[in-house]
Design a protein with these regions (language model features):
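Amphipathic alpha-helical packing segments from all-alpha helical-bundle domains
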Residues: 93, 97-98, 123-129, 141-167, ...
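Short hydrophobic/aromatic patch on the recognition helix
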Residues: 63-74
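Short, well-structured alpha-helical segments
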Residues: 111, 173-184
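Basic, helix-initiating cap at the start of DNA-binding domains
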Residues: 2-49, 56-62, 79-82
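C-terminal peripheral helix-coil segments that are non-catalytic and often amphipathic
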Residues: 1-22, 155-164, 181-223
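Alpha-helical structural segments
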Residues: 33-44, 48-49, 62, 79-102, ...
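Helix-loop "lid/cap" segments that line or gate small-molecule binding pockets
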Residues: 115-122, 129-140
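Short amphipathic helical patch at the helix-1/turn junction of helix-turn-helix
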Residues: 50-51, 71
C-alpha cells in the first residue's frame, strides 16, 4: 500500500498566509493620482523657484514622471497653471473648508471663520505660490486673462458666501458688500506678507482684529 507522507504543519500554515492578489487600481484612480503628483510638484516649484522655474520639464522631474506623461494630462503649461488656480481657490467655494457653522454666536463664528480661512488658504505655501503664478504670468495675455476671469468669479462667490455666513452684516451694516471686499483684501495682503518674516505677535494681532471687525460689522450700531 502506497503511503503518502502528510505535509508539515508549518508548510500548510505558510500556504494559508499567502497574500491575496493586490486590488487593481482603476484607470480613473491612476489618472487622479498622477494629476495630484503633477499639481503638487508644480505648486512646490512655484513656491521655491518662482514662475520661471516652474517649467514643464522641471515639473515632470519633480513629479518623477516623463514629460510625455505630463503632457498627456496637461497639454500645455497654461492648462496646468489654470488647474493650479482652481486647486488653490477651492477652499473659498461654497463647499469649501473655511466656512463655520452658521448656528454659532456671531463673535465665535467670526473667530472660527478667520482661523479657518487663514489656516486652510491664506497662510499656506500654496497661496504664496499662487502669487508667483499671478505675477509671473502677466506677460502671457491669454493665461493672465483666464486667471483674472477666475479671480472675478472666486471673488464674487466669496462675497456672496461670506454674507450668507454672516447675515447680520447685511441686516445691520450700511455697506455689507464693502465689508466682504475689505475682509478678502485684508486676507490677501496678509497672505502675501507671509513671504517675509512676520512675527507671531503681528500675525495674531491681525487675525484677532479682523475677527473683531467682522463681529462689529454685524452688530446694531449704537445711536
Amino acid at each position: 500500500m502506497l503511503y503518502i507522507k502528510p505535509l508539515p504543519s508549518f508548510f500548510l500554515t505558510a500556504m494559508d498566509r499567502t497574500p491575496h492578489r493586490r486590488q487593481r487600481i482603476s484607470q480613473t484612480e491612476r489618472v487622479e493620482n498622477t494629476q495630484r503628483k503633477l499639481i503638487d510638484a508644480a505648486l512646490q516649484l512655484l513656491h521655491e523657484e518662482g514662475f520661471k522655474g516652474a517649467t514643464l520639464q522641471a515639473i515632470a522631474r519633480k513629479a518623477q514622471v516623463s514629460l510625455g506623461a505630463l503632457q498627456h494630462h496637461f497639454k500645455t503649461r497654461d492648462a496646468l497653471m489654470e488647474r493650479l488656480v482652481q486647486e488653490i481657490m477651492e477652499p473659498l467655494s461654497a463647499q469649501g473648508s473655511i466656512w463655520p457653522d452658521r448656528a454659532l454666536p456671531l463673535p465665535e463664528r467670526a473667530h472660527d471663520f478667520v482661523q479657518r480661512a487663514w489656516k486652510n488658504v491664506f497662510c499656506t505655501p500654496h497661496y504664496q505660490a499662487a502669487w508667483s503664478l499671478f505675477l509671473g504670468c502677466k506677460p502671457s495675455s491669454a493665461l493672465f486673462a483666464h486667471i483674472n476671469a477666475q479671480r472675478v468669479q472666486v471673488d464674487h462667490g466669496f462675497y456672496a458666501q461670506f454674507l450668507q455666513t454672516f447675515p447680520e452684516i447685511t441686516d445691520h451694516h450700511p455697506h455689507p458688500q464693502g465689508v466682504a471686499i475689505t475682509v478678502f483684501a485684508a486676507f490677501r495682503g496678509a497672505g502675501v506678507l507671509e513671504l517675509f518674516d512676520v512675527t507671531t505677535t503681528e500675525r495674531e494681532a491681525f487675525l484677532g482684529t479682523l475677527a473683531d471687525t467682522i463681529a462689529q460689522a454685524g452688530q446694531i450700531a449704537s445711536t
